[in-house]
Amino acid sequence: MARPRKTTRRRTARPRRQKRILNCKPSPKTEDDWTFDDAAKSEIAAATATIPTSKDLRTTWWTINDQGSTGSCVGWASADSLLRWHFVKSGKLTTSQLLSPRFMWMASKETDPFVTRPTTFIETEGTSLKTALDVARKFGAVRDTYLPFATGKLYAGKASTFYATAALRKILAYFNLGTNLTDWRNWLANNGPIMVRLDVDSTWDDASFTGGNLDTYNPASTRGGHAVALVGYTADRFIVRNSWGTSWGDKGFAYASLDYAQAAFTEAYGIQV
């Protein structure tokens, strides 16, 4: 009598993750920042406003992009996730136009306070959220056609022309929103997206296998700083917009639990234009 064949169940291998550079540095001198309270007292933020139970700023024109294997997260979080939304809403940009993440990224690296040695040309060397916001406040932002991300070409015109163009899209101010989740909801509901920093952990790395849900932050597994944006919230989650393409998370987005958001996001900034 023939013995029954022993069957083995094959495990489905997870696709290999793309290697990402994580180089967003903590912002310096945050104790000097204007705060949510300052914004409220100056009537930029509505401290006593009724906060809706949910808010979703996502829209079809605001597409997810991919920084690839570069260390440009600060450029993408500031130009593509924060400034672009505001300038489209204020009529300074059409829905089909992109801002240059490369300008925000390179200008931040060139002007940040991390100057023990020249590092603008070193891919893995990063910069901070606050430096990018200072670039946007002092110099402004340019469209991607002036300094394209994909080609790496330099601007061939005069510096005065470049910065005159950038000056058309300056921000007026930025505000440090701290780690108060109620203030975050208030800002998202009444003022727009928030740029945040986190140290990427294993939960973040697994977002493509959890439908984008970020439930529990694992500080023991962190491996470097990253800049992204909050673009909405529900009763128990914050909607996160990344720059790792649509294959990450839920088509480029993630949903951070309140506990995860409180533990993971070490900085949060909103702007006025």
What name fits each language-model region?
Residues 46-58:
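Active-site-adjacent bridging/hinge elements
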Residues 58-106, 120-138:
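Active-site-adjacent structural elements in enzyme catalytic domains
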Residues 19-46:
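Active-site-proximal helix-loop elements at catalytic-domain edges
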Residues 2-5, 10-19, 25, 51-53, ...:
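Predominantly the structural core of cysteine protease catalytic domains
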Residues 27, 37, 41-42, 60-63, ...:
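A generic signature of intrinsically disordered, low-complexity regions enriched in glycine/proline
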